[in-house]
């Protein structure tokens, strides 16, 4: 599905990422972990075409995307739920979802995907005609995730989904991510500072420190790792 090799990227003369390499398989949830300033955001921007890598490759479904535009990458099926949600606050929930379904081939396809989204997030059916800006923070995050997945992407990037949310809302969103991966084969890149939450639903993970991959392993291996426990879990 996604294979990143030897990735270097940054801003102008300042390099942030140093030879990052990682993979995400079909229907797999992979956590990208690290503290603020570790390089997670730059990595996401490099994968989605917002930042152009200076060195390395980003191969998705066998195609090199490192020099492609963000729109091209989006059309290939890589969709990001950005940190901060970035909803159209004066538009209704349904209108926000329609904005995410720009690639739906037919109205019937959109309605089928909409029903799937409502099944995953029942509260959004109740709020369909409500302005997105009037929702709670947790409900707004649900709309942001739903808008990203209504087009049924191949790879969903969740960027800090737990930020500022109550634990029960985070659990609900991560449960939907697990369902998508298991039932629909959608791959998930989970970019998180909350390592406990991330590893609770991920299959594997990578820890980024100072723009480099410091550790990698299964969720169980990383949870048991002494460096992870001391540096990130406070154990």
Protein language model features and the residues they cover:
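ABC-type ATPase nucleotide-binding domains, specifically the catalytic core motifs of the NBD
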Residues: 12, 68, 93-112, 120-125, ...
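Conserved ABC transporter NBD signature motif
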Residues: 56-64, 76, 110-114, 119
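The feature captures the beta-strand-to-loop junction immediately N-terminal to the Walker
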Residues: 33-35
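ABC ATPase C-loop
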Residues: 148-149
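Helical segment within the ABC ATPase nucleotide-binding domain
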Residues: 171-185
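Conserved ABC ATPase signature
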Residues: 131-135, 139
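Helix-to-loop junction immediately C-terminal to a conserved catalytic motif
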Residues: 48
């Amino acid at each position: 599905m996604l294979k990143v090799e030897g990735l270097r990227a940054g801003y102008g003369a300042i390099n942030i990422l140093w030879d990052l390499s990682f993979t995400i398989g079909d229907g797999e949830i992979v956590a990208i972990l690290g503290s603020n300033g570790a390089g997670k955001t730059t990595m996401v921007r490099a994968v989605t075409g917002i930042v152009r890598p200076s060195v390395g490759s980003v191969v998705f479904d066998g195609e090199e995307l490192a020099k492609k535009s963000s729109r091209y990458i989006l059309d290939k099926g890589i969709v990001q739920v950005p940190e901060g949600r970035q909803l159209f606050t004066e538009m209704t929930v349904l209108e926000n979802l329609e904005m995410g379904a720009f690639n739906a081939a037919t109205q019937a396809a959109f309605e089928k995907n909409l029903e799937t989204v409502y099944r995953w997030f029942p509260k959004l059916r109740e709020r369909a005609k409500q302005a997105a800006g009037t929702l709670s923070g947790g409900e707004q995050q649900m709309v942001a995730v739903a808008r990203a997945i209504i087009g049924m992407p191949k790879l969903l990037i969740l960027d800090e989904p737990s930020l500022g949310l109550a634990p029960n809302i985070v659990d609900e969103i991560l449960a939907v991510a697990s369902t998508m991966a298991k039932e629909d084969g959608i791959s998930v890149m989970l970019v998180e500072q909350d390592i406990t939450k991330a590893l609770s639903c991920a299959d594997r993970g990578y820890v980024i420190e100072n723009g480099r991959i410091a550790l990698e392993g299964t969720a169980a291996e990383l949870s048991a790792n002494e460096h992870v426990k001391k540096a990130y879990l406070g154990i």
